[in-house]
Amino acid sequence: MKSLLVLSLMLSLSAWAGLKVGTYNIRNFDYDTREDIHTNKPELAQILLALKFDLIGVNEINNGEELASFIKSKMPSFQVMLTKCGGGNGQTLGFIYNTTKLRLIDFTEELGVTNPGGQPTCRANSRPMAVGTFENLSTKETFIAYQVHLKAGSNAEAYEIRFKQYEYLKNFFQNAEAEGKTSYIVMGDFNTTGYLDRDQDYKKFSAMLNANNLTNLTTSLGCSAYWWGGTDDNSEAPSKLDHIVVSRDYLTNKGASHRAQLHGHCKKVACKPASSEDLGVSYQEVSDHCPMTVEI
């Protein structure tokens, strides 16, 4: 009986100490001017609450004050922290986190990734990288979370810029590790448009991960977003743009066990080509992307 009680206590402590992290590009929250669509907030609330996350990185937040107000009303134990800069289109990024599980120690934004090799800038080019240092309140361990949103597009110019961003990130993380910042998570919209085709984009992205001993915890997930596919055939095509990767030390400290999950319309249609109607409200009125989570 005593051994069972000890085992039960160990399991409960393990469950408390573990974290569920995620990433979600919430397409131009809370109003997408390109599509003239206001974010369907009741649908978004259902999506976020169902994730049961402790920490989620978010992208394309055009109205940070509205997001903070929305989260406060729907998830009162959570807080929002976003970058001030959002690139040329004002798409800020950052984190939503559970204050009963995590304490935010420090938050900065890394502008160098906006224009690798050139002058970093806040209001043009790509988005910055959000950098949050968190403490797990149950274990007192600290880790760094990075949220990225790299250059979009599949043309040669977009690829060239994104390849420079991969190189920048490779050097950035190597320098960070040299400074002792070895336990970290990198997540977000890497915009790896060539990932499913296994083209040069996939190879450059993978090379960046390998150079830094980063493990992609979401390789088993078949997609993370949908787009029109280049033809007007009423069939939207899946793509794999978003990822959650971790450093070797973070994975070693937390244990190798993890479970990746895909959510939203991507899960609904199992990453197969589908019509906008089949993808449903989350695709039409919230985001083309789907949230993904990992329990570590």
Q: What are the functions of these language-model segments?
A:
Residues 175-185, 192-296:
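Metal-dependent phosphoester-hydrolase catalytic domains
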Residues 15-91, 161-167, 181, 265-272, ...:
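N-terminal, active-site-proximal structural segment of metallo-dependent hydrolase catalytic domains
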Residues 20-23, 54-60, 81-82, 93-97, ...:
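Structural recognition of the beta-strand scaffold that forms the well-ordered cores
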Residues 3-13:
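Sec-dependent N-terminal signal peptides
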Residues 26, 35-45, 50-56, 127-230:
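Extracytoplasmic, non-cytosolic globular domains
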Residues 55, 60-142, 146-150:
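Structured beta-strand-rich core segments of catalytic domains in phosphoester-bond hydrolases
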Residues 31-33, 64-69, 78, 89-92, ...:
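Extracytoplasmic/secreted cell-surface and envelope-processing proteins
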Residues 27, 62, 101, 249-251:
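Acidic glycine-/aspartate-rich tracts in secreted/extracellular proteins
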